[in-house]
């Protein structure tokens, strides 16, 4: 037309000559202008090779836009790989490759037909025809993700001849709208084909202002009959398509209609439907193109079933986020989720942020769908109301925003989903591919959707996650983590359920639980929380204390199988972060909710926990003063706070990575480093809040990351359920432990502090890890940690679960190593055993506070009481269940029994709290090592303390060298031989000598260093071996070792039990003899012990050395220089640990 116009212009003189100037010229000019104006519609309507506008549109419609340029930046939104969009101007040619690239989205060449085919056989007959009709498009769009590739395939057939020149305007409008109306993109979701144009402007522009989906297609198809070569068949296709639209018409008609019914957006419905189809289908098959149709037809039972798809688009959407991430090629899903896309992008971003998140997100979203959907009845209802209820705004807004274009759809779909409950069932089937579960979930989701009607999208927790993610991101930075959590809704709400755990337990359970089959259990478990979730929608403060106490004592345990709840509470913690004030409450809630309540169930689940943590809070404040303290305190606090295993579990989840390389997880580093850095305030904010504040954003990744780890969490959760409750007595004890707060002054804090360190090791460990990250004045921090550990001592019993909580960190942190494997095993066993133990030793722990307050106001006494308690735990534990602890706690018993003389100092808490932790101390040998190290170091730092400890150890029930030497040695020798982990408690090789050596170790710094080394495995090695073996190892790791020995004497003492077992367990896995030279003597059992500490250090080094860092602080108060050495070496050790862990 432009050419015509130009011709007209150029030939105007001739025309004027030929025709009367006035009229003809005007006519021609008018015609030229008209043609020019029409030119674009003509271009748009049909490219030469395309039989129909639908076909044209199909070219670009992976993401409903051939014009990737505009959408190129949105490529991630619409599909993670939107390469197609970038070369979209080349789209005519591009669609074919992109379809392949976007295979899930568009299966390249056959896609067009396949889309039609996939959409339906009816569509398939119509495929050629359907190429033209927008209806078919809409139809396809319901199936768009699956059909889309087909669309792409055939349109490429049609359009490749056309070349790229036209498509930017023509094709993009056509194909883009046709491809998928990105509901999220400002264009009205009117036209599947046009409305779906990512260029809203384009489509409004191309489509002559967003004409109705069929109008655009029909108009163009009819307008441009020239391309309608195939249009006549396509004309049939409209008829057929309506038939397909009858069958799948519901997809077309219903899509628009259900869209209208759902959201009133045809495009949105199409987007919904198409993405939904893809979404639902995508869960079955991320590529899902083939599977998608299968799921579509299969899940929905056929073209007609796709109607359920459409209704189930919410569910599909639920899947959609998941498929989106999975099927990034399903850019359309992303696309149609234009809003969702943003959210989803955030979600994927979060997921991507947490690299595991994508997969895990898939895992979560999918698994949550899988598991959560199964658990949906419980989870989704509770979870959406909870998590989405927790984020009702987010839920509603995500529903509105993310599903805003779909909002009408999605919300109605949410509502419709309730109506669609049956359909969501099928859809869930498709979407979840867990039709049965999903179907129940469909109702649940219905319920959930009603409950969280605004969160109807929330009901689609995955979509909601997407929504949440994006939504919450918009909602608030603080909530951004929540968006992550929301986006990870199941993830992060999995975290969030930490805070909201019982409230978001659905999300959590769904997401986290989905990560693990436990999620289903969590579902049921969470169902209680759903009530809590709904009431928890009160939100964290009200809900969490109530929910958490309820949940934690019973649900916490129960919930811990919902380890995701465990880390979900972490996730909730980040959400708490979103609500800093609330968060603090919440975090305590989440923390105490899962563990805080467990810790201080009797205390205000979160208040006493907060109080207790704020006893710690004082410590914590000081810890806040020192980021490390903060970190450590935070660690305990958070573990205590996250005592809800949820908070901790996330660190479990995260620490594993952090353990892996001091990776500075958002969790660990963000706790420790971020905590350290912003931890002071943030930690002060609350450890949970720090999580919440610091982590939530970063936690978001953690949330997502944690979702990955929730499995660990699960282990821990499983273990945790008891641990929190059973540590809970310890925490009650911790409540009585305020004397330990006094103890802070005296180095009961060293003992308790070591206890704390032992308690902390997980926390201290990761805190050390954080410290190792070199953040804080290690020593001040350690002082804080020391007295903080004293504070933690007062919390120490409170902490044991915290240590468990920390231990998740520990487990995760040291190992990541045995993320949960060992500690979860150990935790399971150890929690069982340790709970038993906790019941007796930790009851001792409970008595321990009594010991401390009554008879041992002194740090030494307290420390010894800790030893006693821990010893009771270790030895008594050994006696109680040497086999149990050795075997059940094998890896942890060492930790637990690691310091009969000294480790038991820390072991009391460790035995129970830390021992549970030691259960995780397999990975958190450093937990014990640090604690033990702290204890030993502290003791070696202060001989009186050590002497007292030795005496107390001797006096301590199990600490009593008879018990220790015999009981512990007997059980532990076996365990030590078995696992060499028992050495600590049993001082396995130490035997009776161990007691003397313990004495010596505690009495003599020399022995403390040397005998500590020897104490673990071969105190028999005694000072000489310590001198020689450690020295030789020192030579290897002289810098680290000599300082580390100083650092490690206690550590070795602590490590022995753990170190031996862990050394064996981990040393064989990852021996780093040089790092832990002293642990070689320490692990007399196996020379690997040298590396065992490093293996432990690997696991525990980060934690251990961080605990050593704590020890430096602990010892700083005692022997600043020695601990300075240690502190310095701690760094080195931390480096070793980091090296090992890295």
UniProtKB/Swiss-Prot annotation:
GO CC terms in record: endoplasmic reticulum lumen; extracellular matrix; extracellular region
Ranges annotated as biased composition (Acidic residues): 652-661
Biased composition (Low complexity): 140-162
Single GO BP term: amelogenesis
Polar residues bias spans: 117-128, 240-285, 452-470, 507-516, 531-544, 924-934, 1068-1078
Modified residues (Phosphoserine): 191, 216
Annotated stretches, region: Disordered: 88-193, 214-326, 398-671, 874-955, 1020-1048, 1062-1092
Expressed in which tissues: Expressed in tooth particularly in odontoblast, ameloblast and cementoblast.
Post-translational modification: Phosphorylated by FAM20C in vitro.
GO MF entries: structural constituent of tooth enamel
Cleaved signal peptide residues: 1-39
Function text: Involved in the mineralization and structural organization of enamel. Involved in the extension of enamel during the secretory stage of dental enamel formation.
Name of this protein: Enamelin
Organism: Homo sapiens
Higher taxonomy: Eukaryota, Metazoa, Chordata, Craniata, Vertebrata
